[in-house]
């Protein structure tokens, strides 16, 4: 009888996912831990590895189809495979496993006494058999470092954790990185015969585009948007960045204007805390957030992603610059984790990098505000009674009018302008 592999719970509270790509087909011979498919949820693309070795008999769910946790997605001829219980799917096998707990109590190992704090939000890559093994040993699998392919946790890693040691990183990481690059290379489009005066072609909506569309529609339908547009002379900011650009480069930091904007926004969120909340109309609650995490909208080949700079209020301009650059590289390479894209309290969208100026950015719901920054352009301004040319930055602030009144929004915008106009004040207040 073929082993029926069901879509496992891939975490983040997501109960379904779209099969983006299959890496196997009927007749393929696979080994345990080989990647079967890529699954897209609302937050990221996740690789689904095989828990068994064997031969693929049948792929049950086509690419582009949404599967629910517990659905059979592929059948594998794996004679030696035991029935496995997957998180998110209950069947009679669970009752069969209960007596096994009493068979060999002597094998129960004491819970490891490591004192490090465990990140309960960490995304874990591990086979169901390894998860079960960790539970039997009394180990919190989120505390274990993975040495397998793509950081996957193995039984040896669990044993090493129990012994108080750290696993050695696998040499497969370099090879896996190469494989990922190959896997992410888009396939050449199929030849299409275009006829008539108005030729058209169709394609399935990609998983990432579908997730983006869902988020945009939800935000616009839920939050009444108001957008304020303004501009500010940033000559002093321009000079400040120029002064410290070489110093930053000496320590490997690429200094841009964006970290300054992050610090200015954080200062505004602290001064006007209504912008750092969520409005839960169904529960009749306003959630006040006493942390300042800034999302940075990033344009990638896959679509719009929003990595998050956590605790931006605690970081320097240089630190924020480094983190933004690192997250941008991960976004372009498709290697952002779900944890790196959650937890934002307010977001920045930089249309200026594409040459844009003012626009109406869509709030990243359930946040209540988003700051849009446009290009810096030389414009005539009046300074000390004279018309002079100066670099001017375009700003657009969208906010949820259910929570934020117009005057509050404009006051926040004025505060941001004041800080960007005078970077020394920004450093004092930020």
Curated annotation (Swiss-Prot):
Its cofactor is (R)-lipoate. It catalyses: N(6)-[(R)-dihydrolipoyl]-L-lysyl-[protein] + acetyl-CoA = N(6)-[(R)-S(8)-acetyldihydrolipoyl]-L-lysyl-[protein] + CoA. Pfam families: 2-oxoacid_dh (PF00198), Biotin_lipoyl (PF00364), E3_binding (PF02817). PROSITE patterns: BIOTINYL_LIPOYL (PS50968), LIPOYL (PS00189), PSBD (PS51826). Residues 84-104 have a biased composition (Basic and acidic residues). InterPro entries: 2-oxoA_DH_lipoyl-BS, 2-oxoacid_DH_actylTfrase, 2-oxoacid_DH_E2_comp, Biotin_lipoyl, CAT-like_dom_sf, E3-bd_dom_sf, PSBD, Single_hybrid_motif. Keywords: Acyltransferase, Lipoyl, Transferase. It comes from the Bacteria. The modification N6-lipoyllysine is found at residue 43. This is Dihydrolipoyllysine-residue acetyltransferase component of pyruvate dehydrogenase complex. The lineage of its organism: Bacteria, Bacillati, Bacillota, Bacilli, Bacillales. The gene is pdhC.
